[in-house]
């Protein structure tokens, strides 16, 4: 990218003054926050597979004096605590660390922790499980539709798939991934198409257009590193006017690829699934003077599943978009591996990384450090990025306490005055992210893991001149956590 659930009902005079100031100017990238200085290349398997059963924190009774612990269990963070008895009264259904109790106030109540490192309470966390996070989609203006989508089983057992098409450099039904996808689109219909990709390296840019039928793209090997789709476009790379960048984001009038156009793989079709693959953007950003954003995977569709998929890059590795700011589109990443250094998990989509390894690369940023997540969630959407049951690891040689968990990407905003104007209008980004029940390595900053936004909106977990940031944690462990 480029270098709340709480809403304000009225704006302070200072904010109104900013709003009246207005401002102009284009975002440095067509689709990402302006990053810290950058440079780099691209690898491993998650330690804890999604779906492994982890015990939730004890639930808490809901009566004023109810603090009795309930039993808690979870699989993907969705088990509920069994209402514990309060000290003299009955608890109202305690929530496990990843569970749904009978009550709860979302993020309307007070968090725990510190102002700089807020922690969700058990009741608040109950509203932010995998299934709660993904249960709704649609248009914010007309009201989201609850379809209770449950993708936690993943893409399925590849041993039971019968391929419609096969891709192999030595010759299957197709020699490139894109040609097989094109064939699936041309065939039409609504039945799922299975495309098996043989082990090997495929150097190409791939687009799954919105017109595609449901597609499952997979390799048979559980070693995702054996099947690699890679390319090296980046934001500032020049291109001829009239030439398409990524076909899913053609940017024909542009003279550079732009962030969205840099994507190695773009998935724009609903119900797309991928399993046992590596998708990489291997731009050497250290050799690039500007426009370093280089996306590996970009999505802009609903009900997407990526299982055992490795995503390699540096800045802007994983970009989850929506067709527009008012649309909620969902994606689920199970047992994945994502690496990068600046804003490398970002976008305004609603998505979950479950049982993943998220690895920070230090070679390019050095002592400067970087940011892991950069959500640009619409302020009306309570669910942006959820990282759960995952491991945040780090490349050897990274100093302790160097890296931020993230920052809000104020997408489409040029500066604080522009942001203030957007807030006054009621349509504005306020990135939402929760990292919970995960293990944080020593590279994470202990006291202040959340940075100011991409337009320098100061981080604050309470509303003031600007809306409160929506960046929280819950029940994390490890040397980089709030309770190491």
Regions found by a protein language model. Name each.
Residues 1-21:
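Sec-dependent bacterial lipoprotein signal peptides
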Residues 109, 113-484:
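Sequence-level preference for short, compositionally simple segments enriched
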Residues 23-112:
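Ser/Thr-rich, Pro/Gly/Ala-heavy low-complexity intrinsically disordered linkers and tails
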Residues 7-14, 29, 173, 329, ...:
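Generic alpha-helix initiation/capping and coil-helix boundary signal
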């Amino acid at each position: 990218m480029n270098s709340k659930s709480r809403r304000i009902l009225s704006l302070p005079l200072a904010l109104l003054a900013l709003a009246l100031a207005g401002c102009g100017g284009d975002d440095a990238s067509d689709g990402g926050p302006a990053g810290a200085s950058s440079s780099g290349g691209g690898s491993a398997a998650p330690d804890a597979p999604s779906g492994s059963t982890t015990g939730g924190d004890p639930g808490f009774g809901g009566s004023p004096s109810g603090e009795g612990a309930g039993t808690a269990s979870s699989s993907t963070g969705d088990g509920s605590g069994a209402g514990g008895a309060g000290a003299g009264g009955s608890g109202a259904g305690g929530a496990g660390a990843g569970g749904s109790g009978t009550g709860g106030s979302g993020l309307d109540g007070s968090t725990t922790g510190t102002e700089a490192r807020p922690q969700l309470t058990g009741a608040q966390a109950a509203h932010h499980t995998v299934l709660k996070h993904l249960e709704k989609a649609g248009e914010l203006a007309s009201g989201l539709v609850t379809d209770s989508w449950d993708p936690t089983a993943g893409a399925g057992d590849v041993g039971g798939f019968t391929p419609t098409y096969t891709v192999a450099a030595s010759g299957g039904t197709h020699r490139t991934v894109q040609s097989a996808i094109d064939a699936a689109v041309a065939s039409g219909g609504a039945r799922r198409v299975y495309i098996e990709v043989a082990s090997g390296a495929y150097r190409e840019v791939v687009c799954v257009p919105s017109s595609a039928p449901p597609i499952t793209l997979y390799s048979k090997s559980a070693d995702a590193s054996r099947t690699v789709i890679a390319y090296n476009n980046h934001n500032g790379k020049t291109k001829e006017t009239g030439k398409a960048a990524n076909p899913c984001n053609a940017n024909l009038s542009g003279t550079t690829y732009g962030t969205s156009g840099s994507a190695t793989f773009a998935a724009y079709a609903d119900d797309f699934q991928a399993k046992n693959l590596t998708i990489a953007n291997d731009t050497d950003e250290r050799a690039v003077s500007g426009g370093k954003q280089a996306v590996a995977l970009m999505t802009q569709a609903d009900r997407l599943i990526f299982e055992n998929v490795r995503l390699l890059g540096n800045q802007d590795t994983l970009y989850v978009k929506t067709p527009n700011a008012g649309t909620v589109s969902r994606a689920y990443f199970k047992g994945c591996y994502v690496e990068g250094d600046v804003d490398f998990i970002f976008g305004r989509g609603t998505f979950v990384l479950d049982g993943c390894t998220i690895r920070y690369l230090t070679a390019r940023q050095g002592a400067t450090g970087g940011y892991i997540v950069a959500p640009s969630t619409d302020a009306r959407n309570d669910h942006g990025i959820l990282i759960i049951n995952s491991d945040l690891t780090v490349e050897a040689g990274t100093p302790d306490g160097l890296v931020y968990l993230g920052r809000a990407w104020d997408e489409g905003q040029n500066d604080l005055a522009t942001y203030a104007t957007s807030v006054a209008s009621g349509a504005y980004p306020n990135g939402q992210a929760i990292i919970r029940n995960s293990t944080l390595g020593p590279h994470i900053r202990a006291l202040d893991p959340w940075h100011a936004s991409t337009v320098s909106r100061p981080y604050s977990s309470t509303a003031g001149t600007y809306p409160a940031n929506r960046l929280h944690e819950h029940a994390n462990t490890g040397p980089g956590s709030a309770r190491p």
